[in-house]
C-alpha cells in the first residue's frame, strides 16, 4: 500500500472581469515573463475589438472559436518493431481545448499586423467563421488522423 496521499485536482481560477475559466486559460497562455497585467490588457482589448467589429457578446464569439478549433483526434508517434507509426488517438475535451488555445495564439502571433490585441481579435473572429491559420492546423491534424486510421489498433 502506498504511503503517499492522493493529489487533489487543481481547480482552474476565474478571471476578475468576466469570471470565466476559459478567459483565464487564454490569459495564462498569452503570459510572457510573468507580466500577467499586460496579458490581461492584451486580451481584454482584443475582446473590445471583437465587440466593436461583430456587435455581439465577445465571450460567445470566443466560445464559438474555441469550439470550432477543438480537435477530436490527434496523432501520436508509436514505435512498433523498428518502424514509427503515426497513431490516431481520441483526446479528452480539456486537452483539446488546451490545444485549440495554443493553436489560436500561435497563429495570431505569426499573423501580420500592428499589435497583439489586434492580431488576436482577428484570429478569434476568423476561427469563429471557420477561417484562418488555426482552423487550417486543426484540419491538417484531422486529415493526418484520417489517413493513418489503419494504425489505430496500435494504441
Swiss-Prot record:
It comes from the Eukaryota. One of its GO terms (cellular component) is chloroplast. CDD domains: uS7_Chloroplast (cd14871). It is found in: Plastid, Chloroplast. Gene3D superfamilies: Ribosomal protein S7 domain. The keyword Ubl conjugation does not apply. InterPro entries: Ribosomal_uS7, Ribosomal_uS7_bac/org-type, Ribosomal_uS7_CS, Ribosomal_uS7_dom, Ribosomal_uS7_dom_sf. GO terms for biological process: translation. One of the primary rRNA binding proteins, it binds directly to 16S rRNA where it nucleates assembly of the head domain of the 30S subunit. Belongs to the universal ribosomal protein uS7 family. Part of the 30S ribosomal subunit. This is Small ribosomal subunit protein uS7c. It comes from Metasequoia glyptostroboides (Dawn redwood). The gene is rps7.
Amino acid at each position: 500500500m502506498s504511503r503517499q496521499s492522493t493529489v487533489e485536482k487543481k481547480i482552474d481560477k476565474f478571471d476578475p472581469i468576466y469570471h470565466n475559466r476559459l478567459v483565464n486559460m487564454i490569459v495564462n497562455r498569452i503570459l510572457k515573463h510573468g507580466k500577467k497585467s499586460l496579458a490581461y490588457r492584451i486580451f481584454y482589448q482584443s475582446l473590445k475589438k471583437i465587440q466593436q467589429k461583430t456587435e455581439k457578446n465577445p465571450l460567445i464569439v470566443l466560445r464559438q472559436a474555441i469550439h470550432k478549433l477543438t480537435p477530436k483526434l490527434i496523432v501520436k508517434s508509436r514505435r512498433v518493431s523498428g518502424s514509427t507509426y503515426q497513431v490516431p488517438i481520441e483526446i479528452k475535451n480539456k486537452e483539446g481545448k488546451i490545444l485549440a488555445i495554443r493553436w489560436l495564439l500561435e497563429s495570431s502571433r505569426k499573423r501580420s499586423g500592428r499589435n497583439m490585441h489586434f492580431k488576436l481579435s482577428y484570429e478569434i473572429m476568423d476561427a469563429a467563421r471557420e477561417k484562418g491559420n488555426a482552423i487550417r492546423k486543426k484540419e491538417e491534424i484531422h486529415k493526418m488522423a484520417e489517413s493513418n486510421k489503419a494504425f489505430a489498433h496500435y494504441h
